[in-house]
Amino acid sequence: MSARLGRAASLWLLLAAVAVAFADSSIVVLALPDLLRAYGSSIGGVSWVVTAYNLVLALASLALVWLARRLDERRSVRIGLALFLTASLACGLAWNLVSLVAFRSVQGLGGALLLVGSLPLVRRLATSPKRGVTLWIAAGVVGTAVGPAAGGLLTELLSWRAVFFAQAPLAAAALVVALRAHRGERPAPSERPSPGASSARCLSANIALALASAALVGVLFLAVVLLVNIWRFSPLTAAGIVSAIPLTTFLVQPLAVRVQSRSTAAAGVFALAAGLAGMAFLPARSILWVLASLALAGIGLGIVVPTLSHIALSGGGAGTAPGAWNVAARHLGLVAGLLIVTPLLTSGLSQQGERAKLQATSAILDAPLPVKTKLELAFSLAPVLARPASKGLPNFSDEIAQRHIGKATGLGEKLDSIVQAAFTRGFRRSYLATGLLGLLALVPFAFALPAGSRRSRRRALAAPALALLAAASLLSAETARGAFSYGSKPRLYAPCAARKPFPGHGADAASQRLALETLDQVACHYDKSREQLVVALAAKGADSKALRSLLEFGTVNWSALSKWLSKL
């Protein structure tokens, strides 16, 4: 009895270590804003904390494929856990970004040795080899899904260093188990890999798994960046929101294990792609829309990854090679997804940032504030708007409240709404790209999964039909709530076009009209709108004084402005 309990404890400790190694692919995402502040780096530099781990883990797993026949799984797990434990502690003590990236690379190497060697051990410790494969896959899916939420919770409650320190005790306990493990028997002939169709199915399943993993970048990384950097949620709140992914994954994963068919896997792909499309067409800054989209993506994750992993591992024998291929496929997919999405996101945010500056400047110039106040505000906020979105959007409500202006007009809330809507739309192409990567997984897994009988195929069409219905319902609801207009290109007046006069009566309204008409006259001379002129002057380092004096008197003093206007 005690031996059986010890065996079970060893199994669950090893599975927990496997889950942590998979979770590390995304566990630091919610800590990236803290790392940006701690090290004063760019988002490109800090992103290597994520990329280094996944890249080294994927490449090391590929190398271990060719060493599979010579690799002793017990030694692989022991060395892997020792490296993972040491690197986790070192990451928590990192003194700069370079050292953190270096230690994350070592952690990735340890993770590769652990994951590749753990599969044969789990097969032997479980009640049956088949159950061992199921548990190993489940640990990987759970770890991948829980990673962002767990990292966000630790970052908010303690610090980003706690994300790494928390992994050390578990790795140490698993290392003790691995050191006590005995050499198992050689696999029976029935467990050894079979050539031909089985190999082709394994290859197809791993290719499909890589594409699905690339799509997961949308829910594991993009969603977190949107919630923290653009919508300004705390890491703890963001962790609660993204927990919709593991919750729905847990619910559907048992179904995926029991029913492995093309139709079920297709339903998972459609659900994953639909969740990403839902994130691409968010109609408002609303947690409910994000939860609905992430829940749908979580359902897809819980179906696709276990189904494809079972096929990839079941036909490859009992050694370390099947696990190596599986781990490599998943993490190469993540790295490829990051490489594809990063330039799309950078471009989208840059483009929307320019639009947001013009639209916010227009709102400031049209606000019922004194000319002096609105110009000072427009020029002072221009550098803030020019700051990269990766460093987080400013809180305009607080900025304006500190200046004791615009409270009655709701200008701060209006600026927040304008800028957040614009930058949210900047994620659209990235989400659509990840959704397309997910749909491409349909091609290879058509060869990986059995088609079944004609009767079973007709009956099985219900699963993908249900997924498509859920996708259509979500996208239709978002469209009805204005998804296509949310954050769209602002309708600004063309240079020299006639504009509506400033509303109101009395001396103040007359002064406003005169000032804005003069501003339009100057802007027209340079073939710009008034918003483009103010943004351009602020970008050149001008202040509002010269422009304010010109507007207050209603005459164009070209010589006073020549210093700045000549640069336009």
Residue ranges and their predicted role:
Residues 269-271, 349-382, 522-525:
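Juxtamembrane non-transmembrane segments of integral membrane proteins
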Residues 54-187:
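Helix-loop-helix hairpins in multi-pass membrane proteins, especially solute transporters
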